[in-house]
A protein has these predicted regions:
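Alpha-helical transmembrane segments
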Residues: 1-172
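Acidic, Ser/Thr-rich low-complexity segments on the non-lumenal side of membrane proteins
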Residues: 99-100, 173-195
Length: 195
């Protein structure tokens, strides 16, 4: 989905509810598999926190969902009611392209994973690793979202700086990007022809 939706011009895919539920099941299996590693077969270092690791990998989706659902409940709405308060909507509101939004969120998530990795490498306990991941998860979703929304309302310098950065995320599809776009579109059209 990522390659076609971000890079393809004619090969966009809509996964819908069934697709997102399927991805949720895949992520659940991933987390369950990681957490149920048979310690008798695989020797893991003492301070390797599997729960902090999986939470770091899924940090933005998990904490953004918690933030959005908490806000909906606080407003007296169903936690499942639709709105445009997810983190990716914030980037789009600032003027980021879809690829810029995607790469920004991936970058934020990678930052959390790297912080977990350094905490693990420095020999910090599993509890401290978990505290670091949870603190960063709250920071990159709850605090970051609230801060940027406030800057948008005030039309502050930070807001205009973020808008200037957003303009640079709209790239022309030439050179390497053109090659990737053609490949994504070609691969999907070959699959359709083979059906």
């Amino acid at each position: 989905f990522f390659l076609h939706n971000v890079f393809g011009k004619h090969s966009k895919m809509f996964i819908g509810d069934a697709g997102t539920l399927s991805l949720g099941i895949i992520f659940s299996v991933f987390v369950t598999t990681i957490l149920s590693t048979n310690l008798g077969v695989v020797k893991l270092p003492n301070n390797l926190g599997l729960i902090p690791f999986t939470l770091a990998v899924l940090c933005v989706p998990v904490f953004d969902t918690l933030r959005v659902m908490s806000a909906r409940i606080a407003r007296g709405k169903s936690p499942f009611s639709p709105d445009k308060t997810h983190l990716h909507h914030l980037f789009i509101e600032l003027g980021y392209s879809h690829i810029g939004t995607t790469l920004s969120i991936i970058g934020i998530n990678l930052f959390v994973v790297l912080c977990w990795f350094f905490a693990y490498k420095w020999g910090l306990s599993i509890d401290i690793q978990l505290y670091i991941v949870v603190t960063l998860g709250v920071f990159v979703t709850f605090i970051f979202y609230t801060f940027v929304k406030k800057q948008i309302r005030k039309e502050s310098r930070v807001y205009y700086s973020l808008c200037r950065i957003a303009k640079h995320t709209h790239i022309e599809r030439k050179g390497f990007w053109s090659f990737v776009q053609e490949w994504a579109d070609k691969s999907i059209s070959e699959e359709i022809r083979n059906i």
